[in-house]
């Protein structure tokens, strides 16, 4: 594969970095307002591009304000309701709470982006970039691993309901593993022992370095792409494909048996209600995992292009799109649960009646038993 040397794109790098070249009245280059001691933290790739219009930075800053408000309200509600409602404090839902926590914390760093955007660039400097990178890496990698464990849990609940039950101890162990799994990547970049956090695009956001043209950077990008994206995505795809296969084969077996017995269905009302709820929860989890895949794939592709492909494809404007998709999914996740998780909807309805959520309580075994007893008594009396 042919690698593009950044210096060949820049021509004479020193001329690009000259103050008079960067402060031209006609066209300012990115980084023109960055102190000289901070320029060394910025990949040279970005410094050849003109500064974007002020309106573009204002637009992105405003968009991120919207993302932050929606995500923090939505994920805050998920964490509150799932933690406060006794019926939702199940081992499986510990993973749901952790996913909401990751999405919530992902938006904690957006004030750095917003401040930089309204100040037209790398305003908070290297320190702000490090904070942005640390939080973003922890929450992004942890969200992917959490989605993988949610898929594993749904697989066990639906395909092995008796022996595959989650326990609180197992759920806590999974959470600990998730953050231990993310820690080496974060520490390596923060200490710059392998990789580093650098600004990207309009120099208003930061991520791991995928542009420096050397073996260490390419190896780091390949490894983090595999362990933080390919591995979770593979697990998610496998477990949900197994769920779909199990549901279809189970339904077919029930229909065949019912036909042999000349009955409409072999399920009791309780079984139907319980399975319907489980399927709805699985659908919600599948949707969220699809959103994870759709939102992080552009970022993964972009980093691979930066490390192994044609860097000229990565313009500042183009690289801001994957950054936005990652934040967008943090806004959508809680509303997927609001739509698809029946018990969450019920508890949210109790605590926030002004939301006008209409969710009926599932038919319980006790209610069905009482109804059956009454019918039997009426039949006997007759």
Curated annotation (Swiss-Prot):
Subcellular location: Membrane
Alphabetized PROSITE patterns for the sequence: G_PROTEIN_RECEP_F1_1, G_PROTEIN_RECEP_F1_2, OPSIN
Function: Visual pigments are the light-absorbing molecules that mediate vision. They consist of an apoprotein, opsin, covalently linked to cis-retinal.
GO biological process: phototransduction; visual perception
Its membrane topology: Multi-pass membrane protein
Cellular component terms per the entry's GO annotation: membrane
Organism, scientific name: Drosophila pseudoobscura pseudoobscura
Keywords, sorted A to Z: Chromophore, Disulfide bond, G-protein coupled receptor, Glycoprotein, Membrane, Phosphoprotein, Photoreceptor protein, Receptor, Retinal protein, Sensory transduction, Transducer, Transmembrane, Transmembrane helix, Vision
Disulfide bonds: 129-206
UniProt record similarity statement: Belongs to the G-protein coupled receptor 1 family. Opsin subfamily.
Post-translational modifications: Phosphorylated on some or all of the serine and threonine residues present in the C-terminal region.
Annotated GO MF terms: G protein-coupled photoreceptor activity
Record field: transmembrane: 57-81, 94-118, 133-152, 171-195, 220-247, 284-307, 316-340
Coiled-coil segments on the chain, per record: none
Record topological domains on the Cytoplasmic side: 82-93, 153-170, 248-283, 341-382
Modified residues (N6-(retinylidene)lysine): 327
Any matching Pfam family: 7tm_1
Gene (name only): Rh3
Entry-listed glycosylation sites: 12
PANTHER family reported in the protein's UniProt record: OPSIN
All ranges on the Extracellular side of the membrane: 1-56, 119-132, 196-219, 308-315
InterPro entries noted in UniProt: GPCR_opsins (IPR050125), GPCR_Rhodpsn (IPR000276), GPCR_Rhodpsn_7TM (IPR017452), Opsin (IPR001760), Retinal_BS (IPR027430)
More about this protein: Each Drosophila eye is composed of 800 facets or ommatidia. Each ommatidium contains 8 photoreceptor cells (R1-R8), the R1 to R6 cells are outer cells, while R7 and R8 are inner cells.
Protein name: Opsin Rh3
Domain of life: Eukaryota
């Amino acid at each position: 594969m042919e690698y593009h040397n950044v210096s060949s794109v820049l021509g004479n790098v020193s001329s690009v970095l000259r103050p008079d070249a960067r402060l031209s009245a006609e066209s300012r280059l990115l980084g023109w307002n960055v102190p000289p001691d901070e320029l060394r933290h910025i990949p040279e790739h970005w410094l050849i591009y003109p500064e974007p219009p002020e309106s573009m930075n204002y637009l992105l800053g405003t968009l991120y304000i919207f993302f932050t408000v929606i995500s923090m309200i939505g994920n805050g509600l998920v964490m509150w309701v799932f933690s406060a409602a006794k019926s939702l404090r199940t081992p499986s839902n510990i993973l749901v709470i952790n996913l909401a926590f990751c999405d919530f914390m992902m938006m904690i760093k957006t004030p750095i982006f917003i401040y930089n955007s309204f100040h037209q660039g790398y305003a908070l400097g290297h320190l702000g970039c490090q904070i942005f990178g640390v939080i973003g890496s922890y929450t992004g990698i942890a969200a992917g691993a959490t989605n993988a464990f949610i898929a594993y849990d749904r697989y066990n609940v639906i395909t092995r309901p008796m022996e595959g039950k989650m326990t609180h101890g197992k759920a806590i162990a999974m959470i600990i593993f998730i953050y231990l799994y993310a820690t080496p990547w974060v520490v390596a970049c923060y200490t710059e022992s392998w990789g580093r956090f650098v600004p990207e695009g309009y120099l208003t956001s930061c991520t791991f370095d995928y542009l420096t043209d050397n073996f260490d950077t390419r190896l780091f990008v390949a490894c983090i792409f595999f362990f933080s994206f390919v591995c979770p995505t593979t697990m998610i795809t496998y477990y949900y494909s197994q769920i779909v296969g199990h549901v279809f084969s189970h339904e077919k077996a029930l229909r065949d048996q019912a036909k042999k017995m000349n009955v409409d269905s072999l399920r009791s009302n309780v079984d139907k209600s319980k399975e319907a709820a489980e399927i709805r929860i699985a659908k919600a989890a599948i949707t969220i995992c699809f959103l994870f895949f759709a939102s992080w794939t552009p970022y993964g592709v972009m980093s691979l292009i930066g490390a192994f492909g044609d860097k000229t494809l990565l313009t500042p404007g183009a690289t801001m799109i994957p950054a936005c998709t990652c934040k967008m999914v943090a806004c959508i996740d809680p509303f997927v649960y609001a739509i698809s998780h029946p018990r969450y909807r019920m508890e949210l309805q109790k605590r926030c009646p002004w939301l006008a959520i209409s969710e009926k309580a599932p038919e319980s075994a006790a209610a069905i038993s009482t109804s059956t007893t009454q019918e039997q008594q009426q039949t006997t009396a007759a």
